[in-house]
Amino acid sequence: MLQLEHVTYRVSDEQGEKTILKDVNLSLSERFVAFTGPNGGGKSTLAKVIAGIITPTEGKILFDGEDITPLSVTERAKRGISYAFQQPVRFKGLTVRDLISIAAGRSANVSDACAYLSEVGLCARDYLDREVNASLSGGELKRIEIATILARGTKLSVFDEPEAGIDLWSFGNLIKVFEKMHAELGGSVMIISHQERILNIADRIIVISAGSVKADGVKADVLPALLGTLDMGCRVTAGSDKEDCI
């Protein structure tokens, strides 16, 4: 489905040039892929490169065999790639119902909108006609954003640290949402996360550190290393949902 060929991304500032991604080569076809690794390792940059928010300095991105490297985020969305920001965007003047309708590509009726909001643990009657603005908390915005991804139903859904700003009760509900997506949807889900409970439901785990792939394999092979048996720059501590980056 998705191929990254020799993807490199560099930025320049007053201190010179810095390489954020270094010759990344990946082929992604699994239903559920989790990316993890230390903060600043390049995970979010890689997600934005896939979504089309930023363009790689070098390399090529193929989606269903098509070279999408030069395509904008809008064009990639039309081809079936959706992206959930780590910090969701607020839309003054746009209601939750409007946002779900835009995501679904049609006018969402009350029943459909309620179903999507219920999936993420929100009471529809309290949110449908609310504006997606500063009156909503970060956790509420995050759950609404995930509801729009569900409504969109794309071939590839990319989530950048979806647990950020989510309280403990909501986090348990979030895991159920991803488990259901994994079990029922025909598309693929790509999640950037440090959380053991999310990594534990992935078909494949990829560790990104210092802009490069440091480990890549099935959960049974990679997760024990992340839990402390092998130093790959970032360990996920079992049972604590915390990362220890070195």
Q: Which residues does each PLM region occupy?
A:
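Conserved ABC transporter NBD signature motif
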Residues: G59-E66, D112
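Helix-to-loop junction immediately C-terminal to a conserved catalytic motif
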Residues: A51
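Conserved structural motif at the start of ABC-family nucleotide-binding domains
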Residues: L2, T19-D23
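Walker B catalytic motif
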Residues: E161-P162, W169
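The feature captures the beta-strand-to-loop junction immediately N-terminal to the Walker
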Residues: T36-N39
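ABC ATPase NBD coupling module
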Residues: D67-S82, L226
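Q-loop/switch helix immediately C-terminal to the Walker
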Residues: Q87, G93-N109
